[in-house]
């Protein structure tokens, strides 16, 4: 009898230990993100609060993100693709539909950032952060007010112009300058954009990316095409620099939170997305990263100077002229690549 009791006691102890271990075991979600795209300490706080571990992996652009998501090497649970990549992933059936009952904070997002053409009704995505591509200029070197893409072609600024070394962005700038749609695939319009970029090169224009900061701070370049986060941060730190969104409009991009198809941790992924949609989380991301927030409450927490800065939160008439990138199919992409090759050669 004692032997039976002893065995039964050991069985209970082992069972209790197994249950305890299972309870303490953390769910792990894989988060595919851009580098420096989340507020410091935010993931640690989420892990502590929800007992869910976040394994963060970084990529540099949408194409690299697509490769990661489709390679089959890692099953990601949450990712942050840009607008046109969201559209592509949806069209290929690579995203899970969101259960918004598990993401109640989505109702606090600004309506102006919802129901976009790349995901009508936000069935598969919710906005995480947004921004524009505009112009930064040195007010000590340029006395006039800059307000148009045409200023990037002004002969007065010969040897002072900087353009992002990005096929889609540079061609998009030229299309907006000429009054054409940002996503045009029309042969005539693309040919005109190519001619405009070649003319711009004759003004001593240089192409680059990260070096724009140093060139603008030092005064080696007086006017540049730049991402709004970098532009607004530089303008905040250096009084002689100013960031604007041109009157013709620009690329209005939205990085969105999505759940890749095949996740085994959908509930945990939605918990994480809901956490990132909280006011405090959204505010901290906007303050640290420098881009504008799609969260209404977080926006209202920002300094009045930020809220009233047209480079950050644009006037409605300029906002209405802004466009998001659309996904280009292989044939359309080849047209852009041909234009870009001829511009850069």
Which residues does each predicted region cover?
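Periplasmic-binding protein-like
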Residues: 190-199, 238-261
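A bilobed periplasmic-binding-protein/Venus flytrap-type ligand-binding module shared by bacterial periplasmic
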Residues: 134-141, 176-179, 253-266, 284-288
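Early extracytoplasmic/lumenal segment of secretory-pathway proteins
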Residues: 22-89
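Short, low-complexity disordered leader/linker segments with a strong preference
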Residues: 1-29
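Extracytoplasmic ligand-binding site segments that recognize negatively charged/polar headgroups
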Residues: 39, 75, 79-220
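A ligand-binding cleft/hinge motif common to bilobed small-molecule-binding domains
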Residues: 85-88, 217, 223-240
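Mature extracytoplasmic/periplasmic domains
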Residues: 260-320
